[in-house]
Amino acid sequence: QSLKYFAALVNADKVNGFTISGKGTINGNGHRYWKSFWLRRKVIPKCTNMDELRPRLLYVSNSNDVQISGVRLMNSPFWTTHIYRCNNIKLLNLHIFAPATPVKAPSSDAIDIDVCSNVLVKNCYMSVNDDAVALKGGKGPWADKAPENGSNTNIIIEDCTYGFCHSGLTCGSESI
């Protein structure tokens, strides 16, 4: 089974040299999505992310030489930064935030590194209601069965600061 995702607010597929830089803010305005998720969870306690789909904030896939630097990424409806099947990635001086109160931002991982090589995460501030950095081995709960998925290699995370989060580094549920 392959897991389908909503398009992210910002998407880049097969864009070598993709760059976002500056002092701006990308705001996902996730409050409506979070409220909807928790309402559904209240009615159906076993509801999962697959039952209440939400968009990511930034998704980059199948790309080389990507740099995201200096921006604020906040209030993502779902994962904030999802990097999939990419090589030579720099995530520098980012401020990533999603609230834990008054409405929790469910599964608002700051950075998901997914089947990537040569990744540097440096001088980032992460405060989200889930994982700060999650290493994943492909998309979906059956990622280990899909031939297009694989491992992460040469990942460096340094000089980062963490606010509220469930973990600083997680080998995510899709890891193999």
Place the predicted regions along the sequence by residue.
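Extracellular/periplasmic carbohydrate-active domains that bind, remodel
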Residues: 1-176
